[in-house]
Swiss-Prot record:
<dbReference type="InterPro" id="IPR018271">
    <property type="entry name" value="Ribosomal_uS14_CS"/>
</dbReference>
<comment type="function">
    <text>Binds 16S rRNA, required for the assembly of 30S particles and may also be responsible for determining the conformation of the 16S rRNA at the A site.</text>
</comment>
<keyword id="KW-0699">rRNA-binding</keyword>
<dbReference type="GO" id="GO:0006412">
    <property type="term" value="P:translation"/>
</dbReference>
<keyword id="KW-0689">Ribosomal protein</keyword>
<dbReference type="GO" id="GO:0003735">
    <property type="term" value="F:structural constituent of ribosome"/>
</dbReference>
<keyword id="KW-0862">Zinc</keyword>
<protein>
    <recommendedName>
        <fullName>Small ribosomal subunit protein uS14B</fullName>
    </recommendedName>
</protein>
<feature type="binding site">
    <location>
        <position position="40"/>
    </location>
    <ligand>
        <name>Zn(2+)</name>
    </ligand>
</feature>
<feature type="binding site">
    <location>
        <position position="24"/>
    </location>
    <ligand>
        <name>Zn(2+)</name>
    </ligand>
</feature>
<comment type="subunit">
    <text>Part of the 30S ribosomal subunit. Contacts proteins S3 and S10.</text>
</comment>
<feature type="binding site">
    <location>
        <position position="27"/>
    </location>
    <ligand>
        <name>Zn(2+)</name>
    </ligand>
</feature>
<dbReference type="GO" id="GO:0019843">
    <property type="term" value="F:rRNA binding"/>
</dbReference>
<dbReference type="InterPro" id="IPR001209">
    <property type="entry name" value="Ribosomal_uS14"/>
</dbReference>
<dbReference type="Pfam" id="PF00253">
    <property type="entry name" value="Ribosomal_S14"/>
</dbReference>
<dbReference type="InterPro" id="IPR023053">
    <property type="entry name" value="Ribosomal_uS14_bact"/>
</dbReference>
<comment type="similarity">
    <text>Belongs to the universal ribosomal protein uS14 family. Zinc-binding uS14 subfamily.</text>
</comment>
Amino acid sequence: MAKKALVNKAARKPKFAVRGYTRCSKCGRPRAVFRKFGLCRICLREMAHAGELPGVQKSSW
């Protein structure tokens, strides 16, 4: 889990638009966040395996 202060800081609108960054909506992780889902790679994988993300399925070929 991310520190609450950093999560709150990221939620505020920055003074300059380029300073804004994405965080995982579930755990607050700042890196490897998929914008389409708003989740980090770890949470995305866990939720996809649990079937909590509609339209996402494990690929096999």
